[in-house]
C-alpha cells in the first residue's frame, strides 16, 4: 500500500496557495514546499501543478514574475495577491470545518446489531 495520500478534488489550489503564502516560489519550489509542509505525504505531479498555477494566475489569486532561482536560472516566481490571501483564509476555514465534521463522524462507535 502506498503511504502517500491521494489528493481530494479541489485541494490542489488550496495547497498551492498555502505553499506560496509562506513566500514567493518558483514551480519546483512549490512542489518541494508542499512535500515539506505535508511531511512528504502529498506529492503533486508537475503537470497538475502547472495547470493549477496557470488557473490561479488567471483567477487573480497569484501573481507571476520572472526572477533568478537559487541555481542562477531564470524562473517564474509566484506570490499571493490580496484576493489569493482572502481565498486561502476562506478555503482553510472551510476545510478545517469539514475535517472536524469527518473526524467526528469517524470517531462514532458503530451500533451493535
What do these predicted regions represent?
Residues 5-48:
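N-terminal helix-turn-helix DNA-binding core of bacterial DNA-binding proteins
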Residues 49-56:
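Basic amphipathic alpha-helical segments that dock to polyanions
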Residues 86-113:
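Amphipathic alpha-helical dimerization/coiled-coil segments
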Residues 1-7, 91:
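Intrinsically disordered, low-complexity serine/threonine- and proline-rich regulatory segments
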Residues 18, 32, 51, 89, ...:
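A cross-family signal for key residues in well-ordered alpha-helices
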Residues 80-84:
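Accessory beta->alpha helical hairpin/"wing" motif in late/C-terminal subdomains of nucleic-acid enzymes
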Residues 57-74, 79:
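Beta-hairpin "wing" of winged helix-turn-helix
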Amino acid at each position: 500500500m502506498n503511504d502517500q495520500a491521494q489528493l481530494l478534488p479541489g485541494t490542489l489550489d488550496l495547497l498551492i496557495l498555502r505553499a506560496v503564502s509562506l513566500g514567493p516560489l518558483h514551480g519546483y519550489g512549490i512542489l518541494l514546499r508542499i512535500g515539506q509542509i505535508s511531511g512528504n505525504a502529498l506529492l503533486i505531479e508537475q503537470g497538475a501543478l502547472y495547470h493549477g498555477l496557470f488557473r490561479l494566475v488567471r483567477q487573480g489569486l497569484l501573481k507571476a514574475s520572472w526572477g533568478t532561482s537559487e541555481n542562477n536560472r531564470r524562473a517564474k516566481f509566484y506570490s499571493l495577491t490580496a484576493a489569493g490571501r482572502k481565498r486561502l483564509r476562506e478555503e482553510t476555514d472551510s476545510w478545517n470545518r469539514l475535517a472536524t465534521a469527518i473526524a467526528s463522524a469517524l470517531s462514532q462507535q458503530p451500533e451493535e446489531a
